[in-house]
Amino acid sequence: MQKQNIVILGSTGSIGKSTLSVIENNPEKYHAFALVGGKNVETMFEQCIKFRPHFAALDDVNAAKILREKLIAHHIPTEVLAGQRAICELAAHPDADQIMASIVGAAGLLPTLSAVKAGKRVLLANKESLVTCGQLFIDAVKNYSAKLLPVDSEHNAIFQSLPPEAQEKIGFCPLSELGVSKIILTGSGGPFRYTPLEQFTNITPEQAVAHPNWSMGKKISVDSATMMNKGLEYIEARWLFNASAEEMEVIIHPQSIIHSMVRYVDGSVIAQMGNPDMRTPIAETMAYPHRTFAGVEPLDFFKIKELTFIEPDFNRYPNLKLAIDAFAAGQYATTAMNTANEIAVQAFLDRQISFMDIAKINLKTIEKISPYTIQNIDDVLEIDAQAREIAKTLIRE
């Protein structure tokens, strides 16, 4: 078997590092062909030393210059590129077999679309592609004959629990024809699922990033605490699996052992289980339709004391309700909400606003943007820019 060339968009982040771990566990199968990051020179330098990619790219031009000099000094032949255009070109590189799309935020949008338009096999971990582009993105996957495989643990669990006919029609699954009655999206509920509501005003960034089950970046940890993460996943699931609101259900599962489920019309429920480790869904997408070693500890059923399930409380998780409502309102609303949330979470981490303010800023931002039908990527970027300014203004107020 010939080695697969993997381009990792976001190699210096949490998903990127886990992807490199899977590559390291399967050196005969995969090669880190190109690594892409933002401005983290040190991490990228270490990755280049270890994995010797053909290309390394940083979005920040000055950071790329420093990286290039460091690699030359250490006689590493990796070619260093800089800027958004170079990153988009790497995402569509003719020698790339698979693209891990894991750049967080709107910055990951254009490179992911570049990979799709090149007809690549795209391992999708960038939420914004579907949250902000939805129909545009799904249509592009079809029009350019790209292959889309979901990396998010929940969407990957749903993917594994669906019949092969659905797996081959991501974005266009005829769920009811295949006997699917419900897609059940599970979430841990974050670290504050039992915290009294009156204490929410005192929640600190340190408390919010301490996720009870998963090891994740700061932004996604806060999103998990507010359940915006689940809201974004709800939006993604609707697009990925062509699901109606009636075909979706969100439940809290504190142990994070069942990663999501599919309910069928005959009464069956198929669930995907495993230890909470992102290397499992990453390895599943990289090897699909086969399996490969991920380096993950096997699930020990005797150590699982219980599996519990709780109905979400929208008073506790207003961001979840907001995301569900935003999908119903349209693509402009999900785009504005996503951008506002990005700004609000960073402001919370920087101690400019309180934990409770995050959802308020998200809602107010949507309310200040006029309903609008998105027709192309420029429309998405325009709403993103508007929402960014509105959210920043609200934070200053």
From Swiss-Prot:
Associated pathway: Isoprenoid biosynthesis; isopentenyl diphosphate biosynthesis via DXP pathway; isopentenyl diphosphate from 1-deoxy-D-xylulose 5-phosphate: step 1/6
Co-factor requirement: Mg(2+); Mn(2+)
Residues the record lists as binding 1-deoxy-D-xylulose 5-phosphate: K127, S153, E154, S188, H211, S224, N229, K230, E233
One Pfam family in the UniProt entry: DXP_reductoisom
TM segment ranges: none
GO biological process terms on file: isopentenyl diphosphate biosynthetic process, methylerythritol 4-phosphate pathway involved in terpenoid biosynthetic process
Role played: Catalyzes the NADPH-dependent rearrangement and reduction of 1-deoxy-D-xylulose-5-phosphate (DXP) to 2-C-methyl-D-erythritol 4-phosphate (MEP).
InterPro entries tied to this protein: DXP_reductoisomerase, DXP_reductoisomerase_C, DXP_reductoisomerase_N, DXPR_C, DXPR_C_sf, NAD(P)-bd_dom_sf
Top-tier EC class: oxidoreductase
Key words of the record: Isoprene biosynthesis, Manganese, Metal-binding, NADP, Oxidoreductase
Domain of life, per lineage: Bacteria
Entry EC no(s): 1.1.1.267
Organism listed in the record: Haemophilus influenzae (strain PittEE)
Binding site for NADPH: T12, G13, S14, I15, G38, K39, N40, N126, E128, G217
MF terms (GO), sorted A to Z: 1-deoxy-D-xylulose-5-phosphate reductoisomerase activity; manganese ion binding; NADPH binding
Similarity comment: Belongs to the DXR family.
Binding site for Mn(2+): D152, E154, E233
Catalytic reactions of this protein: 2-C-methyl-D-erythritol 4-phosphate + NADP(+) = 1-deoxy-D-xylulose 5-phosphate + NADPH + H(+)
Protein name in UniProt: 1-deoxy-D-xylulose 5-phosphate reductoisomerase
